[in-house]
């Protein structure tokens, strides 16, 4: 390939090497509906065998935010791909979608094949957890736009749902019950604040109140809830689902509620992961404010009728999903807490 292009900072040979390294990871995510392989101009997915009567496609796109800055600083790239898939997939399953396929975009200052492979191995792991095929992607080497060690990620997912089975929240009423599904930690939101709070901390050390290193606590990959929600949908009428992301409870719970309704959250009904206590103390943050920034141990909330609570909890236990009854729907708008 052109030596002139290489002198400009774009090493095409390294790009070819990266593609070869990725093939085995992409293969792990294969579904029979995928047509073709790596190298085509477009990824192709055959919907005809899925046998939906009124199929609705759901799409979502997202990134990992400034959690990537920590990954770069720590030279830990194998789990941010899971975060990327989770942030996209958890959004579409909140409306009842089943993930079909995923695409990624990696922009970097320098194409390091081993680093790209680590990132994509995480993306493939996330796709496996979600049941989505990784059918395409782009790695853009952009010298001058990014420093050699810098990169950014974006993901895009497409899912499907029967039109009549879309989860919109329209049937939620006062007295319905909110069930919280446990998070794996901070997930991928609030990291500009997290990085500020731990700026003077040795990330390889443990601290009072933390049973793991700060690095392990803040880099825990985001949980993907696809299989848990799929298990629930088969037997329970899920009235609403909220993915607790940026803005915590305050921003995300109302997104699933009809106008005129709110929720009362019982904050003593689940075990709050120790990393949140650590951050709260480190920054001297008001406890109530924490719920407006972080997930506080609840990564997804679902609303069911009171008579469905028992079966919902049983189904979640069968798929090893830790869940709690965390509150009720009320006629007072907004999100309220018993702190």
Curated annotation (Swiss-Prot):
Domain of life: Bacteria
GO BP annotations, alphabetical order: 'de novo' IMP biosynthetic process; adenine biosynthetic process
GO cellular component: cytosol
E.C. no: 6.3.3.1
Catalytic reaction list: 2-formamido-N(1)-(5-O-phospho-beta-D-ribosyl)acetamidine + ATP = 5-amino-1-(5-phospho-beta-D-ribosyl)imidazole + ADP + phosphate + H(+)
Gene3D superfamilies: PurM-like C-terminal domain (3.90.650.10), PurM-like, N-terminal domain (3.30.1330.10)
Protein localization: Cytoplasm
This protein's record includes keyword S-adenosyl-L-methionine: no
A single MF term (Gene Ontology): phosphoribosylamine-glycine ligase activity
Keywords: ATP-binding, Cytoplasm, Ligase, Nucleotide-binding, Purine biosynthesis
Pathway entry: Purine metabolism; IMP biosynthesis via de novo pathway; 5-amino-1-(5-phospho-D-ribosyl)imidazole from N(2)-formyl-N(1)-(5-phospho-D-ribosyl)glycinamide: step 2/2
HAMAP family in UniProt: AIRS
Family per similarity comment: Belongs to the AIR synthase family.
Protein name in the entry: Phosphoribosylformylglycinamidine cyclo-ligase
Designated gene of the protein: purM
């Amino acid at each position: 390939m052109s030596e002139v292009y290489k002198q400009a900072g774009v090493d095409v040979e390294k790009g070819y090497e990266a593609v070869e390294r990725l093939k085995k990871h992409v293969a792990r995510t294969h579904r029979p509906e995928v047509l073709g392989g790596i190298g085509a101009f477009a990824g192709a997915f055959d919907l005809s065998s899925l046998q939906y009567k009124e199929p609705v496609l759901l799409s979502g796109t997202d990134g990992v935010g400034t959690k990537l800055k920590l990954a770069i600083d720590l030279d830990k790239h194998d789990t941010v791909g899971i975060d990327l898939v989770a942030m996209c997939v958890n959004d579409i399953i909140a409306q009842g979608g089943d993930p079909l396929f995923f695409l990624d975009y990696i922009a970097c200052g320098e194409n390091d094949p081993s680093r790209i492979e680590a990132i994509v191995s995480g993306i493939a792991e996330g796709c496996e957890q979600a049941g989505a095929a990784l059918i395409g992607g782009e790695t853009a080497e952009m010298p001058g736009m990014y420093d050699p060690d810098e990169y950014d990620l974006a993901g895009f997912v497409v899912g499907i749902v029967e039109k009549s089975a879309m989860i919109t929240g329209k049937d939620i009423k006062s007295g319905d019950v909110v069930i919280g599904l446990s998070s794996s930690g901070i997930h991928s939101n609030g990291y500009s604040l997290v990085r500020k709070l731990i700026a003077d901390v040795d990330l390889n050390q443990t601290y009072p109140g933390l049973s793991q290193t700060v690095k392990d606590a803040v880099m825990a990959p985001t949980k993907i809830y696809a299989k848990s929600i799929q298990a629930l949908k088969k037997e329970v009428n899920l009235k609403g689902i909220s993915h607790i992301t940026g803005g915590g409870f305050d921003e995300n719970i109302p997104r699933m509620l009809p106008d005129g309704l709110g929720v009362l959250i019982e904050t003593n009904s689940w075990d709050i992961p120790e990393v949140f206590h650590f951050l709260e103390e480190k920054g001297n943050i008001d406890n109530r404010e924490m719920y407006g920034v972080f997930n506080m141990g609840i990564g997804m909330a679902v609303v069911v009728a009171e008579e469905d609570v028992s079966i919902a909890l049983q189904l979640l236990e069968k798929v090893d999903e830790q869940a709690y009854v965390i509150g009720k729907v009320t006629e007072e708008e907004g999100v309220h807490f018993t702190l």
